[in-house]
Amino acid sequence: MAVQQNKKSPSKRGMHRSHDFLTSAPLAVEPSTGEVHLRHHISPNGYYRGKKVVKTKND
């Protein structure tokens, strides 16, 4: 098992963890309906980039 030779200082520990934060999901707004959805995914109404691509139960 590996054992560190010297204790890592709080500053170095913070630098090591600096990229471990969570980011929010990239969201997009559908231009035709105004709904918010994940980028590169269809909206709940079945629209993608302003065009109807999937029939939904409401159609």
UniProtKB/Swiss-Prot annotation:
Which Pfam families does the UniProt entry name for this protein? Ribosomal_L32p
Residue numbers spanned by region Disordered: 1-59
Segments of skewed composition (Basic residues): 49-59
MF GO annotations = structural constituent of ribosome
User: Which GO cellular component term is one of those annotated?
Assistant: large ribosomal subunit
Keyword field: Ribonucleoprotein, Ribosomal protein
- In terms of superkingdom, the source organism counts as Bacteria
**GO BP terms in the entry:** translation
Keyword Lipoprotein included in the entry's annotation: no
Q: Which PANTHER family match?
A: 50S RIBOSOMAL PROTEIN L32, LARGE RIBOSOMAL SUBUNIT PROTEIN BL32
Q: Which family does it belong to?
A: Belongs to the bacterial ribosomal protein bL32 family.
Report the protein name in the record. Answer: Large ribosomal subunit protein bL32
Q: What are the leading ranks of the lineage?
A: Bacteria, Pseudomonadati, Pseudomonadota, Betaproteobacteria, Burkholderiales
